[in-house]
Each structure stands twice: as C-alpha cells, then as structure tokens.
C-alpha cells in the first residue's frame, strides 16, 4: 500500500470522512481545509498512525507544518518509517 493510500485510510477512519477520503490528494489541506480536522483529530490520527505502523511520535515532532496537507503528513510518515 502506498503511503498516501494508508494516510487516506487513517484520515477516513479517524475523521469519519467516508467516500470523501478518496478525493484527498497530496495537495489537500488538512488544517483549515477539513472542518473535521481539529486538535482532537490530530490526536486520533497520530494514535492510529502509531498503531498501524508501529511508530512512536513524540510531542515535539508535531507541528502545524506536519498537518498542513495530506502530502506533508505523508512525508512525515515516510520519514518515521525510514528512521
């Protein structure tokens, strides 16, 4: 599964986006772009990514830049997986 597909799946489940998740691409804005994407959503998304990929995300790794777009979240995840 490609990273963007995995991120879409997590976003679909965490934010209850249903079929809308399929329309998300790398340039889709998360912060300010999806009404469902708030601070609680960040916690849900991070927890789901940690569980699904066996990674640990430290609080100091989280920033607005990570959650700006689907693509920025994918790059963050890829960096964690390559570490």
Give the residues covered by each predicted segment.
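Phosphopantetheine-dependent thiolation modules in NRPS/PKS and related acyl-activating systems
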Residues: 1-37, 41-83
């Amino acid at each position: 599964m490609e990273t963007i597909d995995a991120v879409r799946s997590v976003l679909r489940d965490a934010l209850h986006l249903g079929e809308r998740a399929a329309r998300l691409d790398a340039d889709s804005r998360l912060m300010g772009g999806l009404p469902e994407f708030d601070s609680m959503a960040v916690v849900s998304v991070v927890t789901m990514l940690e569980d699904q990929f066996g990674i640990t995300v430290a609080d100091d790794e989280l920033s607005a830049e990570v959650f700006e777009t689907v693509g920025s979240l994918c790059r963050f995840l890829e960096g964690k997986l390559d570490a």
